[in-house]
């Protein structure tokens, strides 16, 4: 599923991401934009053999199990396939675990490079939330 910007913002808000660990909703919407272009089915292969999955491009080396990543940890305790569902509940649950890990949203390269330090409120502007 490819979400509309405001549709995604509303879903993320409903699932408790607004100000989760101090990160406003705009940060999460911005991260999703630049990680997956709001597409739940996005996947990207990394040079280390791991793969990033879903709307927030969650990595199989640490966070989920795809059955093909050497030395995978599966900290979120989920198959990576659930991160590709239209329903983002599991992706959000895992993202909460990731952002609680010490590096905050710096875990997402696209967030660090394109959202951090910018006016992320623009990502939720005009949305009925």
UniProtKB/Swiss-Prot annotation:
**What's this protein's name?**
Lysozyme C
Q: Which organism is it from?
A: Aix sponsa
- Give the residue spans that cross the bilayer: none
- What is catalysed by this protein? Hydrolysis of (1->4)-beta-linkages between N-acetylmuramic acid and N-acetyl-D-glucosamine residues in a peptidoglycan and between N-acetyl-D-glucosamine residues in chitodextrins
Q: Which gene encodes it?
A: LYZ
GO CC entries:
extracellular region
InterPro entries recorded: Glyco_hydro_22, Glyco_hydro_22_CS, Glyco_hydro_22_lys, Lysozyme-like_dom_sf
**Cross-referenced Pfam families:** Lys (PF00062)
- Answer yes or no on keyword Transcription: no
Q: Which SMART domains match?
A: LYZ1
């Amino acid at each position: 599923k490819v979400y509309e910007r405001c549709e995604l913002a509303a879903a993320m808000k409903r699932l408790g991401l607004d100000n989760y660990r101090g990160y406003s909703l705009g940060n999460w919407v911005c991260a999703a934009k630049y990680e997956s272009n709001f597409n739940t089915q996005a996947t990207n292969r990394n040079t280390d053999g791991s793969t990033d999955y879903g709307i927030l491009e969650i990595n199989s080396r640490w966070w989920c199990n795809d059955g093909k990543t050497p030395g995978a940890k599966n900290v979120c305790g989920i198959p990576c396939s659930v991160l590709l569902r239209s329903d983002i509940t599991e992706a959000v649950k895992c993202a909460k675990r990731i952002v609680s890990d010490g590096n905050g949203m710096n875990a997402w390269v696209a967030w660090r490079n394109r959202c951090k330090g910018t006016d992320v409120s623009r990502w939720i502007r005009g949305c009925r939330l």
